Amino acid sequence: MIFTLEALQADQGDCLLLHYGQPGGARVILIDGGPGGIYNRSLKPRLEELRGRQSQIALEMVIVSHIDDDHIHGIVDLVKQLKTVQEKGQTPLPYRIRTLWHNSFDKLIGRSNPAARNEGSGASAAALDAVVPAGIERESTLHVVLRCVGC
């Protein structure tokens, strides 16, 4: 199995593509989407390049490490585009997100730290929840980690 980590230009944020699998059948995981503007400037063109002439590219997983704008904004832009395409009835969607992981540990255990919360970040997280197209499985990072270790 081959692993390649590709860092896209994301200014002060993070936007990574993890390619894994066998040559000719590699799969892709998107980790964070960078700040505003990165989706149109870096992420979308790269996804289109990977898609090539195929009608759709599968993103095995989209991971939002945390809700700071420099990590989540590009993901919000991606899912907004998918939602718009879906609402127009255009099929297939250009990208198929199989699973969306969002780190929501504090929410799961009922704890919040208002001092650590950024208003813009909270708005981005709410926007992500509001625009996720139908058919995308959402799991929290904690749930996935616990399931993986057999808890």
Which residues are covered by each model-predicted region?
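Conserved beta-strand hairpin/beta-sheet module of binuclear metal-dependent hydrolase folds
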Residues: 1-58
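Flexible, acidic/histidine-containing loops and adjacent segments that form or flank the divalent-metal
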Residues: 1-3, 81-151
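Generic hydrophobic/packing signal
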Residues: 9-15, 44, 61, 81, ...
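A short acidic (Asp/Glu
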Residues: 17-18, 71-77, 111-115
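Active-site metal-binding motif and surrounding structural segment of the metallo-beta-lactamase
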Residues: 26-27, 41-100
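Solvent-exposed loop/turn segments at secondary-structure junctions
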Residues: 35-38, 67-71, 106-109
